[in-house]
Amino acid sequence: MRTPIGLISSAASERVLADRRREQVPTPFGSVEILIGKIGGHDAAVLLRYGEKMTLPSHKINYRANIWALRELGVTRIISQNAIGSVNPAIRPGDIVISDDFLDKTRTRPNSLFDDSEAWVRVDMTNPFCPQTRAALIRAATARSNRVIERGVFVCTEGPRFETPAEIRALQMEGGDIVGTPLVPEVVFAREAEMCFASIAPVINFGAGMAPAVIHTGPGSMNDMYYTDGLHTLIEDIIIDTAKLLVDEARTCGCGRALRGGFHGTRPEWLKHCSLDEGA
Ligand SMILES: [Zn+2]
């Protein structure tokens, strides 16, 4: 069996994930429900990060268990679907951003998979997102849309509230382009787990103070932007195409060797099959 692709999203329609079944995956950090099925005809594991009934806000998600559950299922590449707001006036609702960097503005989340171990790791973040997975997302997205922005700084805030206008102005000055709440620490833990990770982020609103207040439902709302106007379907099509592109590509990025050199302390017993097993 080929290595399954992993998708982390808030929802996954039958279009994007076919032949689905649920699987409860035990991890050292707790048990996680994963949907197993096919994306574009290929094996896939999908994690609904807010829970199936959207009961978990970003600051309450068990990020360590989620990433480790995907790893236990053999996933090496994760696509993260992030509907987000824009901080940059040049990036408008309807655009699709494939981020190449991030700013971490979270406050209460675990810092590392190894926080409860007698070990720590200093992973390199020169390329915070997997370059190979990003390239596949960009190829798939530009084939279907002329509104793809191939670089961007994703600001991850704590939430669950939206930002204030002053916060948005501060994030603009710090170089942020888009803003959302669940990216960090997913991207960090994927790197610590030696998995590839990249984000596809449809823009569905402007940050506070850049436009009239956000409307959640009804005409002109964020939900209309995403679901009624076809953006959500487009994103799912791009994810399907990306899975097809990646399935036959050998990993040429360095994500699978992230622990080499930066690992200190005693290797926890749950850390199996990683680059620390390779010779010097
Ligand atoms: Zn990679």
Language model regions located:
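Metabolite-binding pocket within alpha/beta catalytic cores that recognizes anionic/polar moieties
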Residues: 1-126, 279
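Active-site/ligand-binding-proximal alpha/beta "capping" segment
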Residues: 143-177, 257-276
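Non-catalytic positions within long, well-ordered alpha-helices that form the structural scaffold/packing
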Residues: 71-74, 172, 191
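Short acidic/polar active-site loop segments enriched in Thr and Asp
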Residues: 76-77, 177, 196
